[in-house]
Amino acid sequence: ELTGHDLSLGVKEVIALDRHTLEERFQLEGDQGVTYEFLGSVTGGVAGGSFLYTNRETLSLGVIVEIASLAERRVRPHELLERFRAHPTVAPLVRGGRLVEYSAHMVPEAGQRMLATLAGDGMLVAGDAAGLCFATGLYLEGINYAIASGRAAGEAAAEALAAGDTSAAGLAGYRRRLEERGVLPDFRRFRLAPRFVMGERVHGLYPGVVTGIAERVLRSQGGRPKQKLLPAVTAELRRAGVPLRRVLRDLWEGGRAFGW
């Protein structure tokens, strides 16, 4: 059964800027483009992230946040988007632009656990409707897999119609194509990743620990001896109240999700 932890809400703005301005601001040439992904304070403590990418004469920016975390924090999605747009890193990039589109989209992010029945009698399910959104943090595949599954569905449908059999069995070529083209194997291989990545410690606790370590190591100590890395790590884990056993367990779970 799906919960608010398995779904995210994306809200996006498309802002018009002339091509010359885009190329100048983002140091682009010809058909080049750029994509930025953001984590941290831009989502105000809500689990998720934000993005910005260029198009030919527009740029798109938005946030994608977990439904359960959004409800818990009692934050409106458009407030997060406005906060992101006003961030000192982002504001100069969108300055002078004109809003031409606003959209929202529910994103299935539970991976293997929420894949739908792909074929039935006279029916094929593709894209988000089938749960084919591959969001592991390390890899983000939404549009790509929607295109891949749509193409596979079209080919399977044509094959079934030519054979005169549009039953679930006659449409089995759809699943076969998704297997052969690596879509379904990816979901199986990284089946543990979505829950690990969207966990509270990965989204909240450990980023705080990492930034604390960086501050201890990189910030000037005002004449005091500089810290070595291991004492800085130990001190930050102690400050955050994270026992070493918990860290080792999370490293093991992260390895299972991504490493082997």
Task: Name the predicted role of every residue range.
Residues 197-260:
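C-terminal auxiliary extensions adjacent to catalytic cores
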